[in-house]
Amino acid sequence: MPIRFSKKSHRNVVRQTSGDGAAAKRSTRVRLRPHADWHKRNFLTSVLIPSLFIKRSGNHAPPQFPKIREGEICITWIGHASFLVQTHEVNILIDPIWSKWLKVIKRLKRPGFELHHLPAIDFVLVTHAHFDHLDRRTLRRVAADQPIAVPIGVGNLVHDLGFHIVHELDYWQTVELGPLKISLTPCHHWGARFLADSHRDFGGFVIAANGRTIFHCGDSAYFPGFKEIGDRYKIDIALLPIGAYEAPTGREVHMNPEEAVKAFLELRAETLIPMHYGTFRLGFEPLHEPPQRLLASARAHGIEEKVLVMTEGKPVVL
């Protein structure tokens, strides 16, 4: 049975503690200018409008969650960057989004299962404020007086949704909740949700639970910080983004599949699970291309057996 955290603290409290991440913030924010090879293309006519006429794929099916023993981790990919991570004690939900639209961007693949099929959620993590990671409509339905962790500056976007307490984390800071240790890590991205809120931070999460360690990267371009993350934590499972690398702005904000393999090697993790592809068309690359390129790169590096390409809604015990 999932544990239940104490509910004695006041609802909607935002706790903010500074870690040692100031230097990392200065070096990981993306620059506004496009990369040198960028060729301007029309995202509206090339991607957004054609996507409106693509039939939404994927099937909702009640998930068959297995019994989890001590020392095991069960991971279910919901779609995009959304994951359910389970131990024999705790259910953790990361970057949940069940919405059919990101404003004008159509969801092209359904979530692996309906939201009401979720088990009781003990803890929620949101990596940053972008609409494809922080979906207030979904979070409002998920919130049931449990804690949520977000980067510094993001708490005011979730504090009114029904969570018991909001933990705003700085880079390398850890919050302990029951059997969980949750740490925020740097990434190379940006955190603004609108035009005038670039103060919001962004990052990934390292989750230590049940004797295992999982790294959810959030959104990130490749950057040298992956090696430091691997030095600080012994990572078993790395959830790494592989899509939206042909960004319409030309900014280097997402890894391509080959860079994800490079990041995985520097993290020195045991298993690579790709994410952030196939759900929303956020870049110019074809929807089917990211996993194909990932597997080709993994074969070239002799690590194909370490890559686990998941199917939405199908739990996997590791």
Task: Cite the ranges covered by each PLM segment.
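Zn-dependent metallo-beta-lactamase
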Residues: M1-L93, W98-K100, E289-Q292, K314
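Cap/insert and terminal regions of metallo-dependent hydrolase folds
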Residues: T17-G21, K25-S27, F123, P147, ...
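Divalent metal-coordination and catalytic microenvironments
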Residues: V85, D95, H128, D135, ...
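Structural motif
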Residues: V90-I92, D122-F123, L180, R212-I214, ...
